[in-house]
Regions:
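Flexible "arm" and connector segments at domain edges
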Residues: 1-58, 62-102
Length: 102
């Protein structure tokens, strides 16, 4: 995935290397910012049709996730392809993308 290589180069160029456990904390933190945008824009659920999330926050979360994948030596593109194939198989088998597990 080109985006993963771009993030990896940025991390390397700016000496931002970190172990996976810190990368995971960053992913969760950035997703919290996305959730905050969503919660605030909907007046904490009172107006769900008004949901808005800033591109910047989504970008931060994507950066963090791609940096995590790189720190784990996981090819994000391959992982996404595997996930899409899994969802496709579930839809074909049951008509729904979820696993059916509680």
């Amino acid at each position: 995935m080109d985006e993963q290589r771009t993030v990896a180069a940025f991390v390397d160029d700016h000496d931002l290397d970190a172990p996976p456990e810190y990368r995971l904390l960053d992913v969760v933190s950035e997703l919290g910012e996305v959730a905050k945008d969503a919660a605030e824009s909907t007046d904490y659920g009172a107006h769900p049709d008004r949901i808005a999330v800033s591109d910047d926050e989504l970008g931060d979360a994507l950066f963090a996730l791609l940096a995590l994948a790189d720190s784990l030596d996981v090819d994000a593109g391959e992982a996404l392809d595997e996930s899409l194939a899994k969802y496709e198989a579930r839809i074909e088998a049951s008509g729904a993308p979820n696993s059916g597990e509680d």
